[in-house]
Amino acid sequence: MAQGQEVKKITIDGMEYAINDPAAALKNLPAKLVARIKMYDDKSEEAKFSGYDDGSKSRTLNIETRNPNQMKVFGRGELASGLEKVKDKSYSASVSLNLFDRKRKITFSGNAGRMALNDLPDARYRDEGNKNKNHGLWGNYSSQINKKLQVSGNYRWNANVNNSASLSRQEYLPTGNYESRVYDNESHSNSDNQSHGVNFSLDYKINDKNRIRFNPDFTISRGNQESLSWNSSMENGDTLNRTETKAINKNDSKRAGGNFSWMHAFKRQDVP
């Protein structure tokens, strides 16, 4: 978001970057490398080619880097680990590497994390022990191949595993109807999700009157969710009822889309 409006496109030194993922561009670019930021409403490619304003605009952020003609190599890495005495310690790690010059922008970044807690000591079921994991990779390549051809694309991968468990007990004070009454509940929830995504853009200026643009995108995702609950009630030491519920849900999806356009500028004729 910028000035209350969603940013649709990011350019760095005038070159398109991080297609359909502007947040990634801002996350990987250090502030000390930025010379100037310009926000504007960019016309559609068809409008810029034809010179006719079709009214279609997208909020665009252009980032000008310091010394744009120089090759710049920069990155960062972070690592943190927990000290708790658990079987699998918690950790968090991230790394990024960038190579920038006037005609080419290359970025790679990755992250991994795990948060682990002690197992519930009195649980009937054993699972991942309240362990949550997240992993991700992201890469971008943008290049002005020559005066006619410009390409840009990125790949992203995300994987998340989330597990949780809880135990609860309710004990009621004695009454004339019973000496003791106890309700026990145990619940577990596990999910495993993964996704891959690719965005690509090709812009080829055949000549002054013809131009081709191709923008495909692909997404593949899968997910598994499982939940388990166990409930029981006892009165005066005798079991009144016991229930166990288990649910499993799996989903897989594949999506492909994009657009192809061939723009041609016809010769203008004066209307008499």
Predicted regions and their residues:
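Membrane-proximal, glycine/serine-rich, low-complexity loop/turn segments characteristic
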Residues: 1-228, 245-272
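Solvent-exposed loop segments that connect transmembrane elements
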Residues: 175-176, 232-242
